[in-house]
Amino acid sequence: MGQKINPNGFRLGVNRDWEAKWYADKNYADTLNEDLRIRKFISEKLADASVSTVEIERAANRINISIHTAKPGMVIGKGGKEVEALRKELSALTNKNVHINIVEIKKPDLDAKLVGEGIARQLEARIAFRRATRQATQRSMRSGAKGIKVQTAGRLNGADMARREWHTEGSVPLHTLRADIDYAWVEAATTYGQIGVKVWINRGEILPQRKNKPSKKAKGGN
């Protein structure tokens, strides 16, 4: 099943956390639709800001949004003008108090969403797909990835028949739950049609922390 299921959902509660943290006794559908509108608005507004993940927490009439981005300066703006304008627009969209927290992604080459978007942009610029995937995998491995797998599917290089191709480096153990596998799927809009890009990145194993047991004192002789 590890080969079929989404690796992010497979590891929820093990080494990954939920991106939406709230509970609703009633009006669940309305709250979920509001989440989707928030995510769509942020993805369109910050399309060039290398945004990977948007986490949403709710408490009463307040929404806390954490935006994970590789370009925090672009999101915040000079003197915080951009992020304040974004906060006001989201407050108007939801009719609730919105607080925005910006989280910087230190190593964007280890983030599957950002790696996939980088490959998709190169495909849209008519760069050969093998070259784009090879360069992306090499950068990820140099940044410290234990393994990476990239799948491209569609009319590759403008071929008449659609096909799939994979490029893999290192180890990507999808069945190992303690392995920190990041997964993302991105689409590239080319002149020949849509090309799907799937990225799996193995960032190493996350082992449970062992509690230090109190050391036994040696018993005295006399």
From Swiss-Prot:
Q: Which CDD domains match?
A: KH-II_30S_S3
Under SMART domains, the record lists: KH (SM00322)
A Pfam family this protein belongs to? Answer: Ribosomal_S3_C
Ranges where the KH type-2 domain occurs: 38-106
The signal sequence is: none
Transmembrane segment boundaries: none
Q: Which GO terms describe its molecular function?
A: mRNA binding; rRNA binding; structural constituent of ribosome
Alphabetical keyword list: Ribonucleoprotein, Ribosomal protein, RNA-binding, rRNA-binding
Looking up Gene3D superfamilies in the UniProt record yields: 3.30.300.20, Ribosomal protein S3, C-terminal domain
What biological-process GO terms show up in the record?
translation
List, alphabetically, the GO terms of the cellular component aspect: cytosolic small ribosomal subunit
List the InterPro entries.
KH_dom (IPR004087), KH_dom-like_a/b (IPR015946), KH_dom_type_2 (IPR004044), KH_sf_prok-type (IPR009019), Ribosomal_S3_C_sf (IPR036419), Ribosomal_uS3_bac-typ (IPR005704), Ribosomal_uS3_C (IPR001351), Ribosomal_uS3_CS (IPR018280)
According to its UniProt record, which protein family does this protein belong to? Belongs to the universal ribosomal protein uS3 family.
Biological role stated in the UniProt entry: Binds the lower part of the 30S subunit head. Binds mRNA in the 70S ribosome, positioning it for translation.
Query: Subunit composition?
Result: Part of the 30S ribosomal subunit. Forms a tight complex with proteins S10 and S14.
Output this protein's name. Small ribosomal subunit protein uS3
Q: Which gene encodes it?
A: rpsC
